From Swiss-Prot:
It comes from the Bacteria. It comes from Desulfitobacterium hafniense (strain Y51). Pathway: Cofactor biosynthesis; adenosylcobalamin biosynthesis; adenosylcobalamin from cob(II)yrinate a,c-diamide: step 7/7. One of its GO terms (biological process) is cobalamin biosynthetic process. The lineage of its organism: Bacteria, Bacillati, Bacillota, Clostridia, Eubacteriales. Belongs to the CobS family. It is a multi-pass membrane protein. It is an enzyme of class 2 (transferase). This is Adenosylcobinamide-GDP ribazoletransferase.
Amino acid sequence: MPSMRKLWIALTFLTRIPLPQPEQVTSEEFTQSQHYYPLVGLILGGALWLALTLLLPHYPPLVTAALLLALELILTGGIHLDGLMDSMDGLLSARTPERMLEIMKDSHVGAFGALSAMVYLLLKFSLLAGLLALSSPLVPYLVLFMPILSRWIFLIGVHYFPYARAQGFGQGFHETSRQTRWLFLGEGLLLLFLTYWVLQWPGIAGFILATLFILLFTRKVSRLLGGLTGDLYGASIELSELLFLLGAFPLLYP
């Protein structure tokens, strides 16, 4: 079952859900597995939706929002948040592009990374708590769609900007990604339709804001560094989730 294998590859790559690692993954399989990233987002979003549905009747919005954040970090292992911290350590260091890349590669978290994570988590927690307090029927579906859309949006950087390092997991994407760009765009149009069908204009506003922000962010960083890195892909996932909630909130707020 090639499709299930590609979903398996995508799941073990983007999450820390306890699954056995697939054996002998080829470069072609790894590249093609990217088309299953939104399905990985659906699994993550489904878990968050279920948790929200079970928790909100028994806990206040602040507690529910904190537990949702914790669950997402557990399911992903915090790998995307780690990418955000490493990216901010490098980008905010005000060093040369070469030195920024070296800082990103360092596994130790610096002050800029720690502060960025704190601000990010505070903003995301506040948005989730604020949305949950609105009691809108769309809010559970915003939480469901958040990881789905973010796993598509970050691929903008994969398809349209070079990889900054000579080696790394992202390099394999760029060797064969040109032939899949039309499919990638088709997937985006399908997600846009589904977002409007389920979430109407609040979802569309969040989707557009997140997509435009990541497009501009990856374009600017790619020009600065000569390309993107795995850490920046992780940062794009986290930032697109935040921007999605930020864009949807005003259209739901009374």
